[in-house]
């Protein structure tokens, strides 16, 4: 919501907190069949996208999220070639994935085309790779897409979803994870945004439990800063089949030829160390 002093403020009842940005005006607004998308201009954080009133991203800090949901999982897999992104309509994750030259194809399936339309207009830097020949952009139900995905056809599934409410609700349960498990090859990896490790460890445990019921046997939750989200600290959770390691291709990561603003091989090594309070709470 905006107040009379030109601040956009989002209140988080579940964490008893709020985040605010000083804005200079609203740039755009669209009501899609699924949700209301708004774009604001801020004084210090570039453009701000909200969906149904919830802050999704800013120009200033989205790189934390997009890099951490993409590069750790891709350097953990031995040789990722076929990638599926569920959600991700702002296309920042797609851009990061396509920095990996070994990736041969990426299918992005987001239910709401208007998110991508708005990203192209107001966050064009995130859409640099939309026309890459390796990219396929679909606007459809991600749950149905994964249910119909051929068995053993995918190396990495990235679930770049909103919170587990509204259109994103069906992406956090056993049935969806079973579809991901089936679509992944034996050495495949699932990664999903998993909310704040400071305030939502219960949700992370619920996610891991549902993934386990679907057949996944190994999990790793990676925390990272994300200033525009509740608590300013976010996470992604990786899941693998069987008793698998989350060691990564450290030499390849260190020798990467593409630019990142946050992710490095050294940082990847550090983020694998789970903070004691998180480790104590995870089941």
Swiss-Prot record:
Its EC number is 2.5.1.16. It is an enzyme of class 2 (transferase). Keywords: Cytoplasm, Polyamine biosynthesis, Spermidine biosynthesis, Transferase. The active site is at 160 (proton acceptor). CDD domains: AdoMet_MTases (cd02440). The keyword Nuclease does not apply. InterPro entries: PABS (IPR030374), PABS_CS (IPR030373), SAM-dependent_MTases_sf (IPR029063), Spermi_synthase (IPR001045), Spermidine_synt_N (IPR035246), Spermidine_synt_N_sf (IPR037163). It is found in: Cytoplasm. Gene3D superfamilies: Spermidine synthase, tetramerisation domain, Vaccinia Virus protein VP39. Pathway: Amine and polyamine biosynthesis; spermidine biosynthesis; spermidine from putrescine: step 1/1. Spermidine binds at residues 66, 90, 160-163. GO terms for biological process: spermidine biosynthetic process. S-methyl-5'-thioadenosine binds at residues 35, 110, 141-142, 167. GO terms for cellular component: cytosol. This is Polyamine aminopropyltransferase. It comes from Stenotrophomonas maltophilia (strain K279a).
């Amino acid at each position: 919501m905006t107040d009379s002093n030109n601040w956009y403020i989002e209140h988080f009842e579940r964490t008893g907190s709020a985040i605010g940005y000083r804005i200079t005006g609203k740039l755009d607004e669209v009501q899609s069949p699924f949700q209301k998308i708004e774009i604001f201009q801020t004084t210090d954080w570039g453009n701000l996208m909200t969906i149904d009133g919830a802050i999704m991203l800013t120009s200033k800090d989205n790189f934390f999220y997009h890099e951490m949901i993409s590069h750790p999982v891709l350097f953990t897999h031995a040789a990722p070639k076929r990638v599926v992104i569920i959600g991700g309509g702002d296309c920042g994750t797609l851009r990061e994935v396509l920095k990996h030259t070994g990736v041969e194809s990426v299918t992005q399936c987001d239910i709401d085309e208007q998110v991508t339309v708005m990203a192209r207009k107001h966050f064009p830097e995130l859409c640099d790779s939309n026309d890459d020949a390796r990219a396929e952009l679909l606007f459809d139900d991600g749950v149905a897409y994964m249910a119909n995905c051929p068995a053993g056809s995918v190396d990495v599934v990235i679930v770049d979803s909103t919170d587990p409410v509204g259109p994103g609700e069906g992406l956090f349960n056993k049935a969806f994870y079973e579809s991901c498990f089936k679509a992944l090859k034996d050495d495949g990896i699932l990664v999903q945004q998993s909310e704040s490790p400071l305030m939502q460890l219960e949700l992370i445990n619920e996610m891991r439990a549902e993934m386990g019921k679907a057949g996944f046997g190994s999990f790793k939750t990676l925390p990272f800063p994300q200033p525009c989200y509740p608590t300013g600290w976010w996470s992604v959770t990786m899941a693998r089949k069987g008793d698998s390691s989350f060691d990564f291709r450290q030499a390849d990561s260190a020798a990467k030829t593409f630019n990142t603003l946050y992710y490095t091989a050294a940082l990847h090594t550090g983020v694998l160390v789970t903070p004691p309070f998180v480790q104590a709470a995870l089941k």
